[in-house]
Amino acid sequence: MEHSSPLAAMQPPSVMLGHCFRSDAPTSYHGFSPLPGLGPGGFNFKDLSMKRSNGDYFGTKVVRGSSPTASLAADLSQNFHIDQSPQVATPRRSLFSACLLGNGNRRGVDDAMTTPPLPSSSPAPAMDIMDMSPLPHKPPFISTPEIELDSPTLESSPMDTTMMSTDGLVPDSPTVLPKDGKQERRRPTFLRPSLARSKAQSFQVGMTRPAPESQGPPFKFQTNGINKTSSGVAASLEDMFGESPQRERPMMRINSTSGLNSRLRPPLGSGSHVRGNGSPSAASVRKSAHPNMRPRKQCRRSLSMYEHPEDVIADSEVSYTSNAPLQSISDFEETQALQLPHFIPEEQADNLPRIDKATLVDIKEGKYDNMFDNIMIIDCRFEYEYDGGHIVGAVNYNDKENLAAELFADPKPRTAIVFHCEYSVHRAPLMAKYIRHRDRAYNVDHYPQLSYPDMYILEGGYSGFFAEHRSLCYPQNYVEMSAKEHEFACERGLGKVKQRSKLSRAQTFAFGQQSPEMEDSPTGRCRNNPGDRKLLASPFNDSPGSRFPGRRMLSY
């Protein structure tokens, strides 16, 4: 076998030497002596192959979308069986036909076998082993009528033809293919787009369709010495491929990415999704991610107030005239600027403005008379302190209720009020805060308007002013609050201050003994007795059905 060529191995046994495999061959040819079991009835290939027909290579059904890897896998899956002979002759097996004859006289064959002369064509019509070889060779001489076969391309295969015929397909493609030399037919197409997408997907995996210009000439067969192509005529590319049919598309949205609903069947005659309609771009079918997935909605929902980008640009060019922003409470309070030079100490939590002694001297000298119509100096000390010595022109008020009744009985605009006590630490700030609280309640319907916006506290009190400006005091004396001779009056006065200022240990909220200024919010409506409102000339007049009943005394 090693001294022979592959062509000698592919030759039929009957073509070699006439006495090679005969039963009556002479014994002198020990290399070609008859093999045991190869008599007329000793070798039955059909029984060995489980009585299955021995098909040729080109008659084998090719797997749809076949490739070299798929062909090899098909051959292996069909021939590897237990206790069975090979079913289908493969190209590689046809090269070694001598393997079927056994290895009994292998040495004699190697010694005596030589390459016989190659005939131009085989006279035996039944010897078709050459047809099973993939090597280029001359077709066998067979006396059959003229037959025209289609070129074996990737578009069509026996498997595809079977599937197309079983699915009830209708012809759609305008491609013309000759049948019996005269009759024309159309290639069938799929009705269901799901099958078309599956076929297109299997075709696209691992291979691409070559361009029509790069394809070789059609496969040729020889009949009676005359070469004919599969089309029967020398057709050009324009004749072989026709234009894809134009189908009417429904009006879709501008932002639509698909012109056809995937859940609806395409109309009959629409073959744009079938790869066998003759169009070079028929195989380029876009497959969805999942066949059973619901299609994405093409409409886009948005919460934007603009439908087009041009609207945003147009609105940016338009100038809007909006109202002035509302000022906050602090802005309104700052608009009523204080007219006297003042300062607010950081260690004090009341945020009430303070003036120094020099400013008070300027007020006494009349430097600010053009700013105010009236300037009041309120002395918050007890009566014995005031009588012992006070600033000239100061008025004594140690009761907050009496001072509020006096001020809001007839409010006077352009009035400045200066509070002071002995040191201006406790009694004067309490008096000033209460007056501001009543002022807010009085002007609750005109917030943030105030009847007395200019309220100040003299820094250092009477003790500091008397030390520097004794001449502006009358009598020019200074009586302290803790004087021994006024000890009883001091205790009585301090009791009133503590009772009205904060809760004491024995007087709790349960008995309603709190100070009136602790009841209300600085910016809320005053909830004092109706008689007090009437006394202060408040807009909340008393009525028979007053909504301010008497306060209930609760105890727990």
UniProtKB/Swiss-Prot annotation:
Belongs to the MPI phosphatase family. This protein functions as a dosage-dependent inducer in mitotic control. It is a tyrosine protein phosphatase required for progression of the cell cycle. It may directly dephosphorylate p34(cdc2) and activate the p34(cdc2) kinase activity. GO terms for molecular function: protein tyrosine phosphatase activity. It comes from the Eukaryota. It catalyses: O-phospho-L-tyrosyl-[protein] + H2O = L-tyrosyl-[protein] + phosphate. This is M-phase inducer phosphatase. The gene is nimT. InterPro entries: MPI_Phosphatase, Rhodanese-like_dom, Rhodanese-like_dom_sf. Keywords: Cell cycle, Cell division, Hydrolase, Mitosis, Protein phosphatase. Its EC number is 3.1.3.48. GO terms for cellular component: cytoplasm; nucleus. Residues 371-474 form the Rhodanese domain. Residues 165-186, 257-297, 505-556 are annotated as: Disordered. GO terms for biological process: cell division; G2/M transition of mitotic cell cycle; positive regulation of G2/M transition of mitotic cell cycle; positive regulation of G2/MI transition of meiotic cell cycle; positive regulation of mitotic nuclear division. It comes from Emericella nidulans (strain FGSC A4 / ATCC 38163 / CBS 112.46 / NRRL 194 / M139). Residues 287-297 have a biased composition (Basic residues). CDD domains: Cdc25. Residues 505-516 have a biased composition (Polar residues). The active site is at 421. The keyword Cell division applies.
